């Protein structure tokens, strides 16, 4: 998101000074390239970080408003990414007071950002059950969110946390079960601990996480604690019925080290407002015992 903030500054300079039209056009090209390289087709950052989604949406809207005020034409790609980012934000934040703590997100209240959107007359809506590697079950009081997505590519993993199949449950906008979250201001040891599977509401084996992070590079400022070995979700099945909703998903994060696939099934019984869950370790030929 820092690149987007810098890009927005360049665009503002190009719009402010009349003799900087060439600079403005160049800045728009940088913005277009940034969008292409850092977002998936649904408008979600490739890092899969909810906090990054919110920050990027804020600055993308700000850029659009600047261009509109300057009476320049708003690029179609900017309109499209704002629409898609907005829907993804709505998907993750609806009926919640704060962002869910997955994949680098910290404890941020939604209230101020919602005021920002309302002030500028932006209204996004998305009622999907699955999007961006997350699945959501909800009713008027309960919100259940689970991470069922692959780990990101190395270059997008700066804040990634190895919490695949972890979940959060919120009731009346109060969290009952949550992950640890990520704090960029903490020291490197604490940040690394917060990225472990043990810091999430999911299963870990023998004090090992489902992903492995590198902790030393010749140039740490650029590559600190990025992924060395990620994981893939090898199965997911979502069932939506009148009386219940169910997710079954599994990942291969323990396959190379232990020879097991981790499968998790969670069912939300709507009338009773209860959750039933089970974890399975599925043995393959590589498992020693």
Descriptions of predicted regions:
Residues 12, 87-91, 201:
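Generic alpha-helical structural context detector
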Residues 19-22, 32-33, 69, 172-174, ...:
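Secondary-structure boundary elements
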Residues 1-51:
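Active-site lining segments of carbohydrate-active enzymes
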Residues 44-178, 182:
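Carbohydrate-active enzyme catalytic cores, enriched for enzymes
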Residues 124-289:
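Non-catalytic C-terminal accessory modules of carbohydrate-active enzymes
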Residues 17, 38-45, 92-96, 210, ...:
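Short secondary-structure junctions and interdomain/linker hinges
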Residues 41, 101-104, 205, 256:
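Generic structural "secondary-structure junction" signal
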